Amino acid sequence: MRCAMLVEEHAAFRQAVAYLLARDLEVALVEEASTVAEARAKALENPGVIDVVVSELSLPDGDATDFLVALREAEADVPVLVLTFRKDRPSHERALELGAERVMSKDAPVGEILAAIRGFGDLEDD
């Protein structure tokens, strides 16, 4: 079983994504965070444990790009899927430049979101 971190300010959305990851991809939830600061602290506490991060772009204390910078500085090699309702291309491009594997709309079909996560090499069986 693989491990995920979910970064999203809304607990109900985190719980729904965790359920889908466990049910469809056999991914265990390792950490949850609702802010950039919390995500940074938890990711750096667990180097090498987290196989994938699913993060909202807009967070109460910043956005996913701040978290991506922290991951880069820590040389963490973990794929990050950024989910957002924001449509502005510059913020999507910035997230990709800083290391996000993909940026997707939160209203994308669930199957597409799961397929994107499934495509991350670290989630394949050893």
Residue ranges and their predicted role:
Residues 9, 83-87, 107:
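Conserved active-site segment of CheY-like receiver
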Residues 56-57, 84:
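Active-site residues of response regulator receiver
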Residues 34-52:
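Acidic, metal-coordinating helix/loop segments flanking the phosphotransfer/catalytic sites
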Residues 65-77:
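Short amphipathic alpha-helix used as the core "switch/output" element in two-component signaling
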Residues 11-31:
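Two-component/phosphorelay signaling modules centered on CheY-like receiver
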Residues 35, 63-66:
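Acidic catalytic/metal-coordinating carboxylates
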Residues 108-118:
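C-terminal output helix
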